[in-house]
Amino acid sequence: VRGRLLAELAACPEPGDPEMINRLPYLGAVVNEVLRIHPVAMLMFPRLVEEPLELAGRAFEPGDVLIGCIQAVHERSELYPDPLRFDPQRFLERSYGPGEFLPFGGGARRCLGAALAVYEMKLILATLLQGFSLRLTPASNRPLPPRRRGFTLGPSRPVRLQVT
């Protein structure tokens, strides 16, 4: 992944131009895959059922409250084959609909800062990769379950990197 990202960045006609970096397809796919595996939040805001609804074979009545689980959607194997594997290529081979990829929630209550957050992620990742070599330390090179921090998710322990 790192090698392919560096090759894409090296081929960028204007490597210092943030708008050009923002349009790099593989960089976008890597950021999307990170957000799929590590969404900003696990759950969406509660939604109130306004009229009778059948969803996944279950009936819901007006007044019922539904809460979508972003992580459960992102781990559905029929949408994302081998969902626990980091595979940015999946975002180059398929476009996902608004109900299939929702790292910042969905609908009218989707995070207002989503586009800015993704833009910043791309610029930061490109800048770090072009200037440094990053490696996980042995203590950090093991599965890292998420930890709820208020409404958002974060790592359950520090992520230590060796920077050269």
Model-derived features: positions:
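Residue-level recognition of short, solvent-exposed, well-ordered loop/turn junctions
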Residues: 55, 61-62
